Amino acid sequence: MKTPLTEAVAAADSQGRFLSNTEVQAASGRFNRAKASLEAAKALTSKADSLVNGAAQAVYSKFPYTTQMEGSNYSATPEGKAKCSRDVGYYLRMITYCLVAGGTGPMDDYLIAGLDEINRTFELSPSWYVEALKHIKANHGLSGDAATEANSYIDYAINALI
């Protein structure tokens, strides 16, 4: 899994050199932000159920047709609603993984790589997930550096969808 730190080490090693001062300073900065990232990951994990449920409700409110149309990609049935929550939860889980890893590697490797194909195959609208992520961002309850760290990965996911 790639993170800025692992990429810096790999680049230096492939060039047969030590890390530069700039690379060491970047690593130091990452470790300084790590506490806030871990705090955010812990908070998002502990609030995951309520955040996911609220995000799904935000999708249903903005896109009411999702609860009215029949089909496996809609939320007209309890099974459909469970799938929506599962998918929103997957995005949130990827965000927490990125917070722990200190980079977008988990999201790049496990989510974004096949995102367009998944959405096309199952006729899922990216706008549903953008709305869900906006709800999570607005309601996660984080502040300060923890919020900054979490919001950066939420924004990364949103930008991947649009």
Swiss-Prot record:
Membrane topology classification: Peripheral membrane protein
PTM annotation: Contains one covalently linked bilin chromophore.
Binding site for (2R,3E)-phycoerythrobilin: 84
Keywords recorded for this protein, A-Z: Antenna complex, Bile pigment, Chromophore, Electron transport, Membrane, Photosynthesis, Phycobilisome, Thylakoid, Transport
Record localization: Cellular thylakoid membrane
GO CC term, one of those recorded: plasma membrane-derived thylakoid membrane
Protein's GO biological process: photosynthesis
Transport is among the record's keywords: yes
InterPro entries assigned: Globin-like_sf, Phycobilisome_asu/bsu, Phycobilisome_asu/bsu_sf, Phycocyanin_a
Family recorded in the similarity comment: Belongs to the phycobiliprotein family.
Described function: Light-harvesting photosynthetic bile pigment-protein from the phycobiliprotein complex.
Assembly notes: Heterodimer of an alpha and a beta chain.
Name of the protein: R-phycocyanin-2 subunit alpha
